[in-house]
Amino acid sequence: MLESALKEQLKGIFAGLEANFTFDISVSSSHENKTELLELLGDVADCSDHITCVVNEGDALKFTLLKNGDRTGITFWGIPNGHEFTSLLLAVLNLDGKGKNFPDEAVCNRVKALKGPIHLTTYVSLTCTNCPDVVQALNAMTTLNPAITHEMVDGALYQDEVDALKIQGVPSVFADGKLLHVGRGEFGELLAKLEDQYGIDETKANAEVKEYDVIVAGGGPAGVSAAIYSARK
């Protein structure tokens, strides 16, 4: 399913993996998309000795990421193809500590301080260009805070749920069954909404406070000049 050039790229991307990952697949033997899902995940798993697939009979089409045999809280309902293929790769890399899309330490501490349990579900379209940013942000939060779980759902495969929830646009994020966010969203925006809804554990909210001699606000010519002047001093 994956082209050989892409497989070679994936071998390089996964070369540094240290943990062992499992795509724990649950799929109905009669599901029309079963072969496509198994071929995609099988091709990805072939690119690393640290990734394997386990297939179980189920009544849907989904898989959960396991790390060293333990559940990570990240589940994909559907086939993470198209724009969501990167979301799958980043989920593995983030769980292994190799990801590049984590925010700074202070923001990570805010995620860790969120009170749980929090169960998040994001409905997406594989052609949506705004969906991956939201999926990847929430997967990263799930990696940082064990009290969070996150499911990505391909709305095209679960149209009954989309209709029942009256979803009008994607991505649509639900937190424990309640609509939390619709449309494009940045990491900080999503985190702020979760903080408002669930609160934080003050004992974990220990973001490091740093002291600065000079702070330059703005990125225009004046800001650049001020930064250069300050560095010279």
Regions found by a protein language model. Name each.
Residues 1-17, 85-114, 192-202:
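Short N-terminal or domain-adjacent regulatory/targeting segments
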Residues 3-42, 111-152:
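Local sequence-structure signature of Cys/Sec-based thiol-disulfide redox active-site neighborhoods
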Residues 37, 41, 47-48, 52-72, ...:
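Long, folded non-catalytic interaction modules
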Residues 49-59, 146-160:
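Thiol-based oxidoreductase modules, predominantly thioredoxin-like and allied folds used
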Residues 57-75, 159-176:
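Structural micro-motif
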Residues 67-99, 174-202:
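Non-catalytic, surface beta->alpha helical segment in thiol-disulfide oxidoreductase systems
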Residues 205-222:
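Beta1/beta-strand and adjacent pyrophosphate-binding region of the FAD-binding site
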Residues 230:
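Aromatic pocket-lining residues of Rossmann-like dinucleotide-binding sites
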